[in-house]
């Protein structure tokens, strides 16, 4: 039993030895059959101690950082002891974001960056280019989060529509916004077809590309072609396709000089405001808008202490002041509408500096190229037109300069100024004194030198007065024609200083004054009144003293009726002599006295001063009877 156990143990030991040799053999075979070539350790710049750093020459490096692919070229590349990496000499870095396809190109003499490209410093002729954006500066600082580019050492910036320079630059890639500060100079290209660019100078400039809006502040000056000006701040907006400037807003002490592309000839009667080539505008705020399909100004709006001035080569001048203004232009640059409101005032001066006309009111409106000029009153102020020879106040005043016509409507008040040096007078009123007029409507036609009034007209000078519903005044001749309840009131000079001043009133449906004949005529249902007597007739002929409004005689014709206290006279004609204080009735005159009965004669003379009546008959033997009422 013991021998069998020993034999089995030996067999088992032998098997183990065989198995061991087999394992060793297989292992040796596997080792020799799967042997790898000797590995070359990769260079890791960050792991190399400073004393062992080596510069790589003429490198081209690719780096994959998340969604970014970075390609770097340079004459030299090395890592510093500060854990930063350096590229030097003709450095160019191209970066593409996956999915966007936008390539960003960075160039410079030297670039410093960290391993994740979170912060990059570009030095020496540094530039960054992406799409149409190009930035150049001596030094540029790039930050990845948030992704920005900045410098404080002066920069140049350009894109399809904007280019310029400044001391400081800050650009946000995510917001596509640009900020420039310090001695900013900007060029905004105003449309693909426009040869001119909007040039800006300011302390600060900001532009947001998504909003197509920009802002300039701090001593802003601007120019566009021959147009130029200044303001505290300027805002602009491009059209959605960024092809042209859509709107410009200027704020704070704005001054602008606007020059039309072509000069429009100005002839006699033209409105300088409408056809002036150059306009100087001042206001607290000015907004300029362009046509949507062409780079030309369509409108200008101004607010706050507005002032506009235009001058002609001849020396004539126009100035406008108001709280608000608006101008609309046509596609050729001509003015098609002008509006000024809130305390609006327009002043025109002739080439010798004298006043041509002054207009003021709540609103001044120019339509067309000066075809119509209107002034409207406000709730507390009337419309005013003041010129060398007249002053007109109304609710609304309209001028048609090319036709030389003026119209005034509603609550019209006019003053015809004294014109002693001119031959013509206003009707029978003295030329040495002003004539005052009230009416519902007034019209003046310069070519005919004719005035027309309508509606409850009242014209007066001192105590002499003329009233009617319609009235025409020919200024060249001084002739006056009136219609509709015409009434004239004349003051009579007292013969003695102690006597009271008296007056005589005349009226009719129609009136005509002829200065050459010194004759004032009333027709249709005419009448006359004095302190003591009244008269009615078909017509009245008033003889006036030459060059004055003094009445000499009044002749009545047709169905004359005279009433003097208790007496009534009737005749075909009557002659009233104011200096003699007599009224002579002819043409079958008859006087009816309530106390003395009926008097007849060929001629009856009322002596208004002493209540006597002289009766005359033209028979073979002339007879005269004097009748006096008892006191």
Give short role names for the model-derived ranges.
Residues 1-631:
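Mature-chain termini and adjacent capping regions
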